[in-house]
C-alpha cells in the first residue's frame, strides 16, 4: 500500500467517525440532511427537500470549523465557500432542482457555486497546495470535453462551460495535494473528482425522461456525490490550512 493510500484511508476513516460522533450534533445533522434529501429526491417530496438540503453544507462547514486553529482569513474563505454552495443549493432547489432545464437558473446556481469554488481555491493556495502537471493536464482534458459538450448545445451555455472549467481547475488543485499538507488533507484527492462526477450526473439527469426510475436514481446519485464532495473539500482544505499554520 502506497503512502498516499495509507494517508487517504486514515483520513476517510476519521471523516466517517466524525459523522457518527453523537457527542456533537454536526455529524449526525449532516447525515440526516443528506439522507432526508435523498429520500425527498426518490419520492418527490419537495417540502422534505426544502427542509433538508439547505442544511447539508452548513453541517459540513461546522465539521470543518470545529477544530478551530484557522487564521481569520481562512475562516472567512471557508465561510464564503459554505455561503456560495448553500446559495447555489437554494437557487437550484427553488427551480425544481436537477430536473430544471432553465439555462438562466442553472447559470445563476453555477455563479453561486463558482464564487464558493474561488474562495476554496484561494484557501488551498494559502495552505501551500500548488498545481501539479499531471493533475492539471488530466483536468484540462476533462474541462475541454465538458465545455465542448455544453457549447454544442448553444452559445447560451457559455457561462456553464466557464463554470465547468473553474470546477475542473479546483479539482486539479485539490488532487495536487501532497504530504506537506498533512495526512488529514489527503481527502482532497477524492473530493475534487467526486464534485466533478456530481455535476456530470446533473448534465445526464437533464436528459433523463421526467418521472422515470432513471431520473430518480440520478437525482439521488447527484445528492450522494455532492454531499460527499462538499464534506471532503471543506474538511480537507481546513485540515491543510491548520497543518500549514502549525508548521
Question: Predicted segment positions?
Answer:
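Short amphipathic, positively biased membrane-proximal segments
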Residues: 1-247
